[in-house]
A protein has these predicted regions:
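A detector of single, family-specific signature residues
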Residues: 1-425
Length: 425
């Protein structure tokens, strides 16, 4: 599939049947047009099932035979996950599926009737119109290790979100029943703290158990970081606690549930991380990516999950656009506004790169030097956040070179931006 717009337009010929689909959770609505935008047939509704997909294919074949169309392009506005099964079916059947940008659909739908209304008949026509104008992108569904990585990275993200919810529930519990607990244990997730919370958690229960027995719990578990001093401090703090005493029995049960949820989700997260590491090892070039100081498995896995096989891209600039890191100028007439990033692309990929750039600047000598150069150079110095974006784009080029060309990471080549400036002067 070609990516230049003129080439996309040329792929829609007089012999092409253009079909736009409005994707839904249970039903899809399709409309067919020729290359000039003239509608062929009526709206076709089909269910999100094999029978529905086969009926849709038969409907398209009927229109192809009736209007003498030799090929077909199906355009959709990707809506959540509802298009995945249809996309896989069309791919298996050898039918070309392309994507139109939801933002473009929103902006274009008012042209026909000067109304921002949305309905199942209107959207397929707008989608098909965008396809005939070449305003679409080719469908890409990762397969093999890249598909597995995308799923596992999404699972990790979900588990982290659920762990955050559990930690917020812990914070609420302590704020109500034992606000002073975190003064004694700076980190309630410490092994000594979690072990104690399984035995006792409310201030009155801690006082009743006593410092000796608390210390014995830690000694039996062979924990050396805590001892009698910490146990005594905890008991004294519990005696003076302002925590709520009403409902203490239910509070203890709530803590039991919290601990069970925490351990279960933590075990799941550890297992997912283990799988992610295994998947990364299946991609030989990932070792070179991990050899860069400051780059970890999370960054490598996140990048590969979002981008897939980089060899499908002609240049790293296309990945930069995919991440929504392309520069956007805000100018009109004599006014020249600030240049910003487009933010039109995969937000997860953008987050992976941005979150990787910050520790790189802090720990990697080459990237740190590059950041200092960007922010202090005499000609067009960047603000710190702008420099982080520039570092993110530089990281894309480094990863692309490693994955597409199989080269090793060269710190001196990375610093060429700095070395080039004196030569130009």
């Amino acid at each position: 599939m070609n990516y230049k717009q003129n080439e996309k337009i040329n792929q829609v010929k007089e012999s092409t049947l253009v079909v736009g689909i409005d994707i839904g959770s249970t039903k899809q609505y399709a409309r067919a047009f020729d290359w000039r935008g003239i509608e062929l047939g009526k709206v076709f509704t089909f269910s999100n099932s094999r029978e529905g997909f086969e009926a849709f294919k038969a409907w398209m074949q009927h229109l192809q035979d009736k209007y003498k169309k030799s090929d077909v392009i199906v355009g959709i506005e990707p809506t959540g996950h509802y298009w995945f099964d249809l996309g896989a079916y069309l791919e298996d059947e050898g039918i070309l599926l392309v994507m139109v940008n939801p933002y473009a659909v929103k902006q274009t739908k008012e042209l026909d009737d000067n109304s921002q209304s949305k309905n199942d008949r209107k959207d397929p026509k707008v989608i098909a119109k965008l396809v005939t104008e070449g305003r679409y992108s080719a469908q890409y569904t990762p397969d093999g290790v890249y598909a597995d990585l995308r799923i596992m990275v999404a699972n990790r993200k979900r588990l982290i979100r659920e762990m955050t919810q559990i930690k917020n529930r812990f914070a609420r519990w302590f704020a109500i029943y034992f606000p002073e607990y975190t003064d004694v244990f700076g980190d309630y997730e410490a092994q000594s703290s979690m072990l104690l919370l399984k035995k006792v958690c409310t201030p009155e229960a801690i006082v009743e158990l006593g410092a000796e027995k608390i210390n014995q719990i830690w000694r039996d578990a062979k924990l050396r970081a805590v001892g009698m001093k910490r146990a005594t401090t905890l008991c004294e703090t519990a005696k003076r606690s302002i925590g709520l005493k009403k409902g203490s029995s239910a509070a203890r049960y709530e803590m039991k549930l919290l601990l069970e949820d925490y351990e279960y989700k933590k075990a799941q997260l550890d297992a997912v991380m283990e799988e992610i590491e295994k998947l990364c090892r299946k991609i030989p070039e990932s070792e070179q990516m991990l050899a860069i100081k400051g780059i970890g498995v999370i960054t490598v896995a996140g990048f590969l999950a979002e981008v897939g096989d980089v060899r499908r891209f002609e240049s790293p600039r296309q990945i930069q656009k995919l991440a929504g890191l392309s520069l956007r100028e805000n100018s009109s007439g004599k006014h020249k506004g600030q240049t910003t990033i487009s933010k039109r692309g995969r937000s997860n990929l953008r987050a992976v790169l941005f979150n990787a750039a910050i520790p790189l600047i802090a720990t990697n000598p080459e990237f740190k030097s590059l950041h200092e150069y960007y922010t202090t150079r005499a000609n067009n110095p960047l603000k710190k956040k702008q420099s982080v974006i520039a570092i993110s784009c530089k990281l894309i080029r480094v990863f692309y070179a490693i994955l597409a060309n199989g080269v090793t990471y060269d710190p001196q080549k990375l610093l060429s931006d700095i070395h080039r400036q004196p030569q130009a002067a």
